[in-house]
Amino acid sequence: MDKLNKITVPASQKLRQLQKMVHDIKNNEGGIMDKIKKLKVKGPPSVPRRDYALDNPADEEEQWSDDFDSDYENPDEHSDSEMYVMPAEETGDDSYEPPPAEQQTRVVHPALPFTRGEYVDNRSSQRHSPPFSKTLPSKPSWPSAKARLASTLPAPNSLQKPQVPPKPKDLLEDEADYVVPVEDNDENYIHPRESSPLPAEKAPTVNRSTKPNSSSKHVSPPGTVAGRNSGVWDSKSSLPAAPSPLPRAGKKTATPLKTTPVPSLQNASNVCEEKPVPAERHRGSSHRQDTVQSPVFPPTQKPVLQKPVPLPRFTEGGSPAADGPVPSFPFNSTFADQEAELHGKPWYAGACDRKSAEEALHRSNKDGSFLIRKSSGHDSKQPYTLVAFFNKRVYNIPVRFIEATKQYALGKKKNGEEYFGSVVEIIKNHQHNPLVLIDSQNNTKDSTRLKYAVKVS
């Protein structure tokens, strides 16, 4: 029925409905369809102008797709490409003249090398101005290097052209104070130079020549005086003392060294050998050298006192040449008494050697058998040796003589050892008290009493 009603609707109503629809469509032109059209028409926003030229502008167009949904405008579509001028097109080699071409037309300004060598010392060695004028043309290459770098950079001519010319202008302003050594102006340039280098050459030469000569002349005589005064000192202290102390000593060393030579000729050779170190330490001042040399005279008597002192030391060391006379004087009484006391004892073998003494003890083959014999080394510190037998072994124990206390002791020096007034007291003590026997090979200790006296046949 609804369909029939719709069909039967009068034509006037249908017209009205159509008019309303058309009117609504016209009013909705700014609606969705209009927005869709704008989206299709609009491109990405314009890009700010770049300071460099693109190699292939077509490549940039390919980067933006048609479906790009943002509000970014494409600069190729909206911007006037014809009005935009690329810097590469404008800065052509034909229209732009590099700065070195302008400077080559000008006169070469040699102010740059003269700023370096403006000092008088450098000018004095090279008086002639022509060599400087020959070397000056090498400097124009300096601005040309910067011009090459400037040409590679993509910058407008308005920025580059004002940068290049002010540099030579500044140089010309600085050069106004100086005279350029051109061939035409050589005469005007040489006159002030001739007056200035002459005093500059004389001043250093005079000062440098006089200072070392004056110091060497004044210092050399004291060195020779010191060498003549002491013969031994020349070989030891002359070499290190020559470079540094002599210029420091100066004029003061001349007078004190002259006063000391006469007495030092006799004994300086012996004394200077003992004390070279203080002389080297105080070689800087003349007064310290006097203090070193002045006490040298009294010690000349000290070596006389020290000479007899080492003699008994050599005798104590056991030198055979000194043992003969020296121990005989203090020990005549003691050794004579010992020999008299030991001569009648049954256990004293006298000047028996070690082998025969050991054989005699092995023949006895009794633990505690013993004898006393003279030491084979004939040492004043070890005059006798105690030979004991225990556990089928023979022990040779040295009997030491202590000079300070005139006493005897057994074995090597050790803490808490016993001292005896004679060899007989040693035998009597160990006949009642055990004697410690140390085997150095097996590192063992045994003890026994001296029981059986053995005679060597």
UniProtKB/Swiss-Prot annotation:
Keyword 4Fe-4S on this protein? no
Annotated region Disordered: the residues are 38-306
Q: Where are the transmembrane segments?
A: none
The cross-references to PROSITE patterns, in alphabetical order and at most eight, read:
SH2 (PS50001)
Where, per UniProt, does this protein localize?
Answer: Cytoplasm; Cell membrane
Is the keyword Cytoplasm assigned to this protein? Answer: yes
Q: Name one GO cellular component term.
A: cytoplasm
Any GO BP annotation? cell surface receptor protein tyrosine kinase signaling pathway
Give the compositionally biased regions (Polar residues).
206-218, 256-270
**Keywords linked to the UniProt accession:** B-cell activation, Cell membrane, Cytoplasm, Membrane, Phosphoprotein, SH2 domain
The record's section on SUPFAM superfamilies has: SH2 domain
How does the record describe the protein's post-translational processing? Following BCR activation, phosphorylated on tyrosine residues by SYK and LYN. When phosphorylated, serves as a scaffold to assemble downstream targets of antigen activation, including PLCG1, VAV1, GRB2 and NCK1. Phosphorylation of Tyr-84, Tyr-178 and Tyr-189 facilitates PLCG1 binding. Phosphorylation of Tyr-96 facilitates BTK binding. Phosphorylation of Tyr-72 facilitates VAV1 and NCK1 binding. Phosphorylation is required for both Ca(2+) and MAPK signaling pathways.
Ranges of compositional bias, category Acidic residues: 57-74, 172-187
Which residues are annotated with the PTM Phosphotyrosine? Answer: 72, 84, 96, 178, 189
**Ranges for the SH2 domain?**
347-454
UniProt-listed Pfam families: SH2
Indicate where this protein is primarily found.
Answer: cytoplasm
Q: Where is the composition biased (Basic and acidic residues)?
A: 272-290
Gene Ontology molecular function: any one: molecular condensate scaffold activity
Task: State the superkingdom.
Answer: Eukaryota
List the InterPro entries hit by this protein, alphabetically: Immunoreceptor_sig_adapters, SH2, SH2_dom_sf
Q: How does it assemble?
A: Associates with PLCG1, VAV1 and NCK1 in a B-cell antigen receptor-dependent fashion. Interacts with VAV3, PLCG2 and GRB2. Interacts through its SH2 domain with CD79A. Interacts (via SH2 domain) with SYK; phosphorylated and activated by SYK. Interacts (via SH2 domain) with SCIMP; this interaction is dependent on phosphorylation of SCIMP 'Tyr-120'.
Give the protein's function.
Answer: Functions as a central linker protein, downstream of the B-cell receptor (BCR), bridging the SYK kinase to a multitude of signaling pathways and regulating biological outcomes of B-cell function and development. Plays a role in the activation of ERK/EPHB2, MAP kinase p38 and JNK. Modulates AP1 activation. Important for the activation of NF-kappa-B and NFAT. Plays an important role in BCR-mediated PLCG1 and PLCG2 activation and Ca(2+) mobilization and is required for trafficking of the BCR to late endosomes.
Q: Would you tell me the protein name for this molecule?
A: B-cell linker protein
Which lineage?
Eukaryota, Metazoa, Chordata, Craniata, Vertebrata
Q: Which gene encodes it?
A: Blnk
